[in-house]
């Protein structure tokens, strides 16, 4: 308990310090600095708010007990406040529990069709729409950065950014990070004339997005830049002039495309930012793997057997193999109703972190 009190005191002190800095006109005029402070302020605010409620509830409970000693009519107030104090204590403990340091960050997601040809590309498109619909419902902003479509309008590969509309402790990373891996689909493809169920797959990569384009630190000699015409349709919200950019990182072989912006210069800057995010993620995974804390990388191969989740169309069932989650509401999940699934994954992550802390 004493450790928790000390931690809360430190957080309150930091929170008040940030509040003072944000009130400084000079800081307010520096957009980059103000954005960073706002982000940290949003991370701390729920802890400070719940702690204030808890302090008040404890004081009210102490007063009610004292009055109940003199007048039993106040016992009902004691009975009301005791569970409230317990609830707030649990809520505060949950807020103080170890968290992923990137949870408040925006993300970039890449979706790639895997084994299964045209059917895999159509499924990759289904995944993209699922994430976009979920983002709309959950209050995240999203934009398509690059899109390579198949002949039937599926997705060969696609990159999307997801951002919080306002700084939040629970940013896009806190929910979308669980989507990295191989997703498997079982259904009758539109290209199948015999009505046979087939299995195909799509891969999803998720990584935090750098806050500033200025943070890109990639040597020009390590990249090859190609310019091409976008393949996206007008309705996809991507540019269709000859300004699309493809950047290949020669040391790693990573390839990033961007066609969202209206000029080659803007698309190159955005693609470099995405590439930096991927390189940062690779470096993070290498460090964590060395420390023995990292699970298997998100997508080692596009093999259908290496899957994190299966989408079974005939049975309307979704299965997450990491936590044994099963639900017969695939149709609603594909419509963006992913909250139950994500909360189950978050609960498992919290349990694992608490266990690791001992």
UniProtKB/Swiss-Prot annotation:
Protein name: Peptide chain release factor 1
Keyword Protein biosynthesis in record: yes
Organism: Corynebacterium aurimucosum (strain ATCC 700975 / DSM 44827 / CIP 107346 / CN-1)
Cellular component, GO, one term: cytoplasm
Function: Peptide chain release factor 1 directs the termination of translation in response to the peptide chain termination codons UAG and UAA.
An MF annotation (GO) of this entry: translation release factor activity, codon specific
Post-translational modification: Methylated by PrmC. Methylation increases the termination efficiency of RF1.
Classification via Pfam families: PCRF, RF-1
Modified residues (N5-methylglutamine): 236
Alphabetical UniProt keywords: Cytoplasm, Methylation, Protein biosynthesis
Subcellular locations according to the entry: Cytoplasm
Family indicated by similarity: Belongs to the prokaryotic/mitochondrial release factor family.
């Amino acid at each position: 308990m004493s450790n928790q009190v000390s931690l809360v005191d430190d957080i309150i002190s930091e929170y008040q310090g940030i509040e003072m800095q944000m009130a400084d006109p000079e800081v307010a005029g520096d957009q980059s600095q103000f954005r960073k402070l706002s982000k940290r302020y949003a991370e701390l605010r729920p802890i400070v708010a719940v702690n204030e409620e808890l302090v008040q509830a404890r004081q009210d409970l102490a007063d009610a007990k004292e009055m109940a000693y003199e007048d039993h009519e106040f016992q009902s107030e004691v009975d009301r406040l005791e569970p409230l104090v317990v609830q707030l204590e649990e809520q505060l403990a949950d807020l103080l529990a170890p968290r992923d340091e990137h949870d408040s960050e925006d993300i970039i997601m890449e979706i790639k069709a895997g084994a299964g040809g045209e059917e895999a590309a159509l499924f990759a498109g289904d995944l993209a729409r699922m994430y976009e619909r979920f983002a709309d419902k959950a209050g995240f902003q999203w934009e398509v950065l690059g899109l390579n479509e198949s002949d039937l309008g599926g997705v060969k590969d696609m990159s999307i950014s997801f951002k919080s509309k306002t700084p939040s402790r629970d940013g896009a990373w806190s929910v979308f990070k669980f989507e990295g891996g191989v997703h498997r689909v079982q259904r009758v493809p539109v290209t199948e004339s015999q009505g046979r169920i087939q299995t195909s797959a799509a891969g999803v990569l998720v990584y935090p997005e750098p806050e500033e384009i200025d943070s890109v630190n990639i040597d020009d000699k390590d990249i090859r830049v190609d310019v091409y015409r976008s393949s996206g349709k007008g309705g996809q919200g991507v540019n269709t002039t000859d300004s699309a950019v493809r950047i290949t990182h020669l040391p790693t072989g990573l390839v990033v495309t961007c066609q969202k912006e209206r000029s080659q210069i803007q698309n190159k800057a955005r693609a470099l930012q995405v590439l930096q995010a991927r390189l940062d993620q690779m470096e993070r995974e290498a460090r964590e793997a060395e420390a023995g804390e990292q699970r298997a990388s998100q997508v080692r191969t596009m093999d259908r057997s290496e899957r994190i989740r299966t989408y079974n169309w005939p049975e309307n069932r979704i299965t997450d193999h990491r936590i044994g989650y099963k639900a017969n509401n695939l149709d609603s999940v594909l419509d963006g109703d992913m909250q139950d699934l994500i909360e189950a994954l978050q609960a498992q992550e919290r349990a694992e972190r608490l266990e690791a802390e001992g």
